[in-house]
């Protein structure tokens, strides 16, 4: 969105760490729409020990997890841990020690820990602790949304080709993102939304 504001509407190629992505920005009156095309996605299970450590960080237990979406390392250009919760209340209650979270995220190479609750098969609520970046919580995380879309495809979730994400509602800065999910395993995910000026 910032590139579009400076250079006009268009598609921009970016290099982030080892990943190549494209971003789009288009002005629509006083608003700007933005979209990113992620690198290839992948996911892998995490160990039982690592899961216990992550649950303890947030004070969650196995009983708080949604068994349909197993905890996993997910990647759509950056690494994330996904923990799917089985209630909106548990998502809202999220709290953690930021320094301990940072140490865990740095050690495991996770940009964020993606906490998610599935309201429906295509509508998800998320929070993204971002201690890795020195921030308690990130209000809009396109990379995590792309990684989640890829993971849902990996596990055969009935996403119908797209999911909508409501993120950071509980921090008073709600964002809405859409991930378009092609059928080909590992293929790029398109994430889009409207940008606000900070």
Which residues does each predicted region cover?
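Active-site proximal loop and beta-alpha junction motif in alpha/beta enzyme cores
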Residues: 1-198
């Amino acid at each position: 969105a910032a590139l579009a504001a400076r250079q006009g509407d268009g598609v921009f190629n970016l290099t982030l760490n080892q990943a190549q992505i494209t971003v789009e920005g288009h002005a629509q009156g006083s608003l700007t729409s933005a979209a990113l095309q992620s690198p290839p996605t992948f996911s892998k299970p995490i160990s039982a020990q690592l899961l216990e450590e992550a649950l303890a960080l947030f004070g969650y237990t196995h009983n708080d997890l949604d068994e349909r979406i197993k905890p996993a390392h997910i990647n759509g250009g950056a690494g994330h841990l996904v923990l799917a919760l089985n209630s909106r209340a548990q998502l809202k209650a999220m709290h953690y020690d930021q320094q301990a979270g940072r140490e865990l995220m740095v050690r495991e190479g996770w940009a964020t820990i993606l906490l998610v609750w599935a309201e429906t098969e295509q509508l998800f609520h998320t929070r993204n602790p971002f201690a890795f970046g020195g921030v308690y919580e990130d209000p809009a995380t396109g990379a995590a949304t792309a990684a989640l879309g890829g993971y849902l495809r990996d596990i055969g979730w009935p996403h119908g080709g797209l999911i909508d994400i409501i993120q950071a509602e509980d921090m008073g800065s709600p964002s809405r993102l859409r991930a378009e999910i092609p059928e080909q395993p590992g293929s790029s995910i398109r994430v889009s939304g409207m940008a606000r000026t900070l």
